[in-house]
Amino acid sequence: MDTLPFGLFEPAYRKGITGAALVVRGVLYFRNGYTPTVRKALVQCFEQYAAMVDEYHHALEVAAGQKPSKEGPLRWFYTEGKQPMAYEKAPAFERLATSTPGDTSLVATMTSADHKLATGFYDFSVFALGEWKATHNRGLDTLVFTVPRAFLEQRPGKFQALFTAMCEALPIVHGHAGYGVNLPPMELNANEASEYFYARRYGPGIDVGDPMGYSTVMLEGAIKTVDWIVALNADLVRAAGGADSLTLPPDWYVRQPFGDGGLIVQAGVAPQASVSAGPGKPPLPPPAYVLLDSALRPIIAEKMDILQSGTLDSTAPLLNTTIATEAWLKRFVLQPDQLTEQWRELHKTPTVGSSKAAVGANLSRFRKIMGLPEPVRSNGFGYDGGSPG
């Protein structure tokens, strides 16, 4: 059940289109999105995303016995102050990114939705503040990209490699990737209950809340959540106690250095929503996420504004109070004596070793195509699998 109908839990808003889609989502928070250098990097990130999902989309068509279409999966284009446009008739993202003045916010979303008010499995969104707002602490810039869950199995290593390449291309502050829920760009509120339904049904490893929400982009010196993959700049790595203080066993955690002291941590070989607690019991958090949360607890936000709003008519459960939001932020927190059991459970899960080569090969290719600087020296625990030094 990877999609839900529009307004499923909001009878007054129901439509016969898709209102929520369970996906694998990457989110990056960065600075200086008003500068030509970063705008150019954003274009490169989009071009690699588009090429990656186009190839996959066409391969699925061939596998289904269809003739490959000329278009990729993206169908709709949204930008600030304008009505949604059919993607093939919209201005290219490159044109928008390079023509939008630096003192004006760059806002764009491209989705694979079948209808302009719906959502789909593919989404690429950018919100980059204009110079005045960016230099007056009005929040971080945001890039979001998503793929269907099956993509990870059918294109091993590509998602992680693109996420890492984007971290190297942009002046990121932090980021995360894992399971999330795409909602319609123009109709978030009527479908937020569906997002929270997924998290309650499948488990705490599913992210909740708009990645571009005000309370999230305004976080200072903290991150909203751990996830399958977490990226931290050097300041946040230091605030967490330093890379050497992270007692994360390399058989289950990738630690990929980037930039000047930044670190990307991958928890487990694949994203997880939960682990089963048995019939009739609520799902338990994945051990790899619990232990990463414990390691990064000094920099994880304990308070935020509400993560969801819903509609005026909402009666379904939502994270629309500060109490519910704060409980969600601490959903991976366990008592110290319970953490010991999580280490034992972690050792029952697949190790990351055999998956790193595919990521490393794809990352090398992305770096070459995007013209990224030489990577920092290996620490022996990253995707390259090399020895330190």
Which residues fall in each region the model found?
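C-terminal interaction module
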Residues: 1-66, 185-389
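Internal, hydrophobic cores of structured domains that mediate oligomerization or house catalytic pockets
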Residues: 65-199
